[in-house]
Amino acid sequence: ESLQANPWIEGVDIKREFPHRLVVTPRERVAKVIVYIPADDVAWAVSEKGVWIAPVSLIAGASAEGKPVGPDPKTGQLPEGATMLEGLDAALAAAKMAHALLLTDAPSDVNPKGGKEVTSKVVLAGLEYAKGFSVKFLQQIKDLSIPSVEAISANLNNGVEVSLGAADNIAEKERVVMGLLEKESGVTYVNVRKPGAYTFRSAPL
């Protein structure tokens, strides 16, 4: 019962071994996305199955090399020489360390509860993108902005903004964006809400 009370534990497998031994193996939930709610300056982990897991610590920093670092589990302090991060920057670092996609600009009416299923349509849409994009494309995404379902957009590491809209035709949207970035230079904005009729802007060379 104490294990199952932990929101990071999805369930337990119990195996009986001869003669009188029980082996209990917990099944842990893994964060697929981290949802940052700026109005409350909190971040929550969400599993691939769409369950709010628990709040994520925003005590995060950047090493001298610019890599995200978390606090020491024993002391709660950041490593010596690390730069303290706050707000969105801390949430980005937390998501990187969790190997999860960061969902930003979540509406203030998003109401996380540990161990409960996500009911927010915009968070579920962001989760669908995280599950539908390839690992290669996810590695190029800095964060996913989710103010509303129709206004979902991806901010890429190279500075390009990609307007995605509702979570449909996900693989096709990725294919269009990847192909466009390979073919065109100086792209700053791509609109693939309708991947068959996409538009883009480029910076003047």
Region locations from a protein language model:
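Charged, solvent-exposed interaction patches on well-folded alpha/beta domains
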Residues: 11-205
